[in-house]
């Protein structure tokens, strides 16, 4: 019998030279073709988050796919964190640095209440920049990030280093 990590690793597809030459892209979309495996993934995240969170925030866009299911199973609200200009007001925004430039994310400022314990979910942890910006956004709203969860951790990019100042509870199901 395979472990969940082995099943995930067998399902994720390496795409060579995407999105640019020299990059090996970890394509998680085949996970969504297997409903049984997807349920196992969601259940694994739920088990790690039980009793620890009041809200699940999903990062646009692949953080929405399992994030909403995690929230539903935990019976807590699901909040979208989106690129700037995609949510109606009132919003709070947070900018962060990219390799070449900046990006900005937003959340509806009414949805994260003071003292809320927040799980931030996304598909892949790379440099940690987006997740770090999300945690700063949660703080601006008065919440506290109590857990991060990712399907994949690209450990060679050291993304966890940017997140441990918010919480050391960082759940990943596999790493490369």
Task: Give the positions of each predicted feature.
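PRPP-associated nucleotide enzymes
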Residues: 1-176
């Amino acid at each position: 019998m395979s472990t969940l990590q082995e099943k995930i690793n067998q399902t994720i597809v390496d795409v060579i030279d995407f999105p640019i030459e020299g990059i090996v892209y970890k394509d998680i979309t085949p996970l969504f073709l297997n409903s049984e495996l997807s349920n196992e993934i969601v259940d694994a995240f739920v088990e790690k988050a039980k009793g620890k969170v009041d809200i699940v925030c999903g990062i646009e866009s692949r953080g929405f796919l399992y994030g909403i299911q995690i929230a539903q199973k935990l019976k807590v609200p699901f909040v979208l964190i989106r690129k700037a200009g995609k949510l109606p007001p009132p919003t709070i925004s947070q900018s962060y640095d990219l390799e070449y430039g900046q990006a900005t994310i937003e959340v509806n400022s009414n949805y994260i209440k003071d003292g809320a314990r927040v799980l931030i979910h996304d598909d892949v942890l790379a440099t940690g920049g987006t997740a770090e910006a999300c945690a700063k956004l949660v703080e601006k709203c008065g919440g506290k990030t109590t857990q991060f969860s990712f399907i994949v951790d690209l450990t060679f990019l050291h993304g966890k280093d940017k997140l441990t100042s918010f919480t050391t509870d960082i759940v990943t199901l596999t790493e490369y």
